[in-house]
Swiss-Prot record:
It comes from Mycobacterium tuberculosis (strain ATCC 25618 / H37Rv). GO terms for cellular component: cytosol; plasma membrane. It comes from the Bacteria. PANTHER family: ADENYLATE CYCLASE, TERMINAL-DIFFERENTIATION SPECIFIC-RELATED (PTHR43081), BLL5647 PROTEIN (PTHR43081:SF17). Gene3D superfamilies: 6.10.340.10, Nucleotide cyclase (3.30.70.1230). This is Uncharacterized protein Rv1318c. Keywords: Cell membrane, Membrane, Transmembrane, Transmembrane helix. Belongs to the adenylyl cyclase class-3 family.
Length: 541
């Protein structure tokens, strides 16, 4: 199956190459085909493009129909001959004259009528409900217009040739009307394709009227009826007339039926295949867009250009992506307010009040002389300074897999080991504290901050009420880190840690710290042995 491609697949590839209308292509055009232009294209250029395309499609479809009709009346049913058995003024005068007149007048009138129905889009304004209705009716009106011109031609030629020989009546009645139905069906499909940009603009104003949107099934059955059902009925009528008139030999009748059957089969297949191809295009566009969303491209948005269930599919995709964007925005805001780790934990588990005992390391950071800082600078400068200060804190805490639990004025409380567990939270906390102290000296020499590090058992969880709570940690290490931060403000390096936290760290991290004397911290009964880092950058003079 993979080695041999079907005829339909080969034809599909040809059309995809010509029109680039395929979801397999890396850059799927907004309207499904580059022939229809870009969404940002000016209305004037779009009008010219669509008018030229419609005229070309209408003329081409009619020329093909005329060629098939000529084939049917001359070769499929050769007797009586329209050349030998009819006057020359009719075959070489009236017929070509009407064909040229109808082709020129019909192409101009139908194209102009379609452009008039799209006047609202050309003027760049929102359509009224009636204008929206006329826009969606445009393909049907083009098809009906072709049926009228071909119907007049059928009546005229059948009458004129029938006056000469009544054997011409069934031939022209069937052949011309048969081709007219095929041409009308083809122009309907082509017009619907060409008007996609305007249909998209109309759909932005609201869904199409329900009676103009029969759906995929209704549209498919109508095309089948006009492209295959009616021609088959015509074949049956031709056979019935032949049974009555008996003006063909058995071989001539068989040849005629075979030719007409082949024409019906081929053109019916082509029409149904084009319909299926046009129907599949929006699905392919959605599929390509889904792949982009899977890659995380949530800015993906589709142009809704179909008035059937396929348009609902495109609209539903846009609603889905809008919901995903909103969800991602809320997730981002949630993570910024409570911390990425807390937000991720809240998504994984059902949030509830209470907590659990955890072994964590705590880093408390507070700016030295914050009161003087606030009174000596304009408020805007203070906010800018604080944002730069906290940016350093957040950057280093995130880099060491910690959590900035809260900002308290010009201070911050960071946790290592909750809510996400760490193999050795002391290592991460001590390394982050050293990095913050070093960066503050180098990047913000005008702003000094005391840093305290402690470790131990705490209760970590959601504290508050059911309507409003926040994730935090409660325990002795938090108080100890705050007291060490106060003490560090008056010490060289502005960074102190408890010996207990340093002792619990890895050998590599312990080598970066030196133990000092015991100090009784405010609010503590037992003295705490201090530790300070070695090799920190000294403050600039």
């Amino acid at each position: 199956m993979s080695a041999k491609k079907s005829t339909a697949q080969r034809l599909g590839r040809v059309l995809e190459t010509v029109t680039r209308q395929s979801g397999r292509l890396p850059e799927t055009p907004a309207y499904g085909s580059w022939l229809l232009g870009r969404v940002s294209e000016s209305q004037r250029r779009r009008r010219v493009r669509i008018q030229v395309m419609l005229t070309a499609l209408v003329v081409t479809a009619n020329l093909l129909g005329i060629g098939v009709a000529l084939l049917l009346v001359t070769i499929a049913i050769p007797e009586p001959s329209i050349v030998r058995d009819t006057p020359r003024w009719l075959t070489f005068g009236v017929v070509p004259g009407y064909v040229l007149l109808a082709l020129a007048l019909g192409s101009y009138a139908l194209t102009r009528q379609t452009v008039q129905a799209l006047r609202w889009a050309i003027e760049g304004r929102k359509p009224t409900r009636e204008e929206e209705r006329r826009t969606f009716l445009a393909p049907w009106r083009v098809a009906v217009g072709h049926l009228m011109f071909w119907g007049v031609g059928t009546a005229l030629l059948t009458t004129l040739y029938g006056l000469i020989n009544n054997a011409f009546i069934p031939r022209f009645l069937f052949a011309v009307s048969f081709c007219g139905v095929l041409v009308a069906t083809a122009t309907y499909l082509h017009t619907e394709f060409a008007l996609r940009p305007f249909a998209a603009q109309a759909l932005e104003a609201g869904p199409p009227p329900r009676r103009l949107a029969p759906g995929i099934l209704g549209r498919t059955m109508v095309v089948w009826l006009l492209g295959s059902g009616v021609p088959v009925v015509g074949i049956a009528l031709m056979a019935m007339f032949e049974m009555v008139l008996l003006n063909l030999t058995r071989m001539q009748f068989a040849t005629g039926v075979l030719i007409i059957s082949m024409v019906t089969l081929v053109f019916g297949f082509i029409l149904m295949w084009i319909l299926a191809w046009l129907t599949a295009t929006p699905v392919r566009v959605v599929r390509a867009a889904l792949r982009r969303v899977e890659r995380g491209e949530l800015r993906t948005n589709l142009v809704v250009f179909d008035g059937t269930e396929l348009g609902e599919l495109q609209r539903g995709f846009n609603a889905m992506v809008a919901g995903l964007r909103e969800r991602e925005r809320v997730r981002d805001l949630f993570g910024r307010h409570v911390g990425r780790e807390v937000a991720a934990a809240a998504e994984r588990e059902r949030s509830k009040l209470g907590g659990e005992e955890r072994h964590v390391a705590v880093v408390f950071i507070d700016i030295v002389g914050s009161t003087q800082l606030v009174t000596s600078r304009p408020p805007a400068d203070v906010v800018k300074l604080l944002n730069k200060f906290f940016a350093i804190v957040v950057d280093e805490v995130d880099r060491h897999h910690g959590l900035v639990n809260k900002f308290e004025g010009d201070a911050s409380l960071t946790i290592f080991g909750a809510p996400n567990r760490l193999p050795c939270p002391e290592d991460k906390a001590l390394a982050a504290a050293r990095a913050i102290a070093d960066r503050l000296v180098n990047e913000m020499p005008e702003c000094q901050a005391g840093i305290g590090v402690a470790a131990g058992q705490v209760i970590a969880g959601n504290v508050g009420a059911r309507e409003r709570f926040e994730y935090t940690v409660i325990g002795e290490p938090v108080n100890e880190a705050a007291r060490l931060c106060e003490l560090a403000k008056s010490r060289p390096g502005k960074l102190l840690a408890s010996a207990q936290a340093v002792d619990a760290a890895s050998e590599e991290e312990r080598a970066r710290w030196s133990l000092g004397r015991h100090v009784k911290l405010r609010g503590h009964d037992q003295p705490v042995r201090l530790a300070k880092p070695v090799g920190l950058t000294k403050p600039r003079r």
